[in-house]
């Protein structure tokens, strides 16, 4: 048995099934949908893999900082981070996040605006502001 303060290393690899290999992408990587076959749950995985190779090492510490900050957040209007996988020797990694079922925000807004449901737009706006107020109350500035 390990003593308090000693590092505990888990040997089992965690495997996921790729459900959607192209949920989204940006200048610092892409997002995919994975399924944990053991608990039968979907997750979004954000892979840190900058488009430019020179950026990989330069922004890796920012990626790790994002993990630390986001993992502390717990609010109904902020996507939850459940786990992370950091590969420091390769300057890459993954953030495993809550998967929210539904259409993309732009598609949803287009549908709501087309229907003229301005009450729903107001409701969505209130939820957005509520989430940002929580983030700001935690001393975090969203960019």
Which residues make up each language-model segment?
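Protein kinase glycine-rich loop
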Residues: 20-27, 31
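Conserved N-lobe loop of protein kinases adjacent to the ATP-binding glycine-rich P-loop
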Residues: 35-43
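Conserved beta3-strand ATP-binding lysine motif
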Residues: 46-51
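A short, aromatic-enriched beta-strand patch in the conserved N-lobe beta-sheet
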Residues: 83-85
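Conserved short submotifs of the Hanks-type protein kinase catalytic core
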Residues: 89-104, 108
């Amino acid at each position: 048995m390990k003593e308090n303060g000693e590092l505990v290393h888990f040997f089992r690899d965690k495997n996921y099934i790729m459900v959607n290999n192209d949920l989204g992408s940006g200048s610092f990587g892409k997002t995919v949908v994975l399924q944990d076959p053991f608990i039968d749950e979907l997750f979004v995985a954000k892979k840190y893999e900058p488009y430019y190779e020179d950026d990989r090492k330069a922004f890796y510490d920012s990626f790790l900082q994002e993990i630390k900050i986001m993992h502390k957040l717990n609010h109904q209007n902020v996507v939850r981070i459940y786990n992370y996988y950091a590969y420091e020797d390769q300057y890459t990694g993954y953030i495993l996040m809550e998967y929210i079922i539904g259409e993309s925000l732009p598609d949803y807004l287009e549908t709501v605006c087309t229907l003229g449901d301005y009450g729903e737009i107001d409701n969505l706006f209130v939820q957005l502001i509520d989430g940002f107020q929580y983030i700001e109350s935690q001393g975090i500035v969203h960019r």
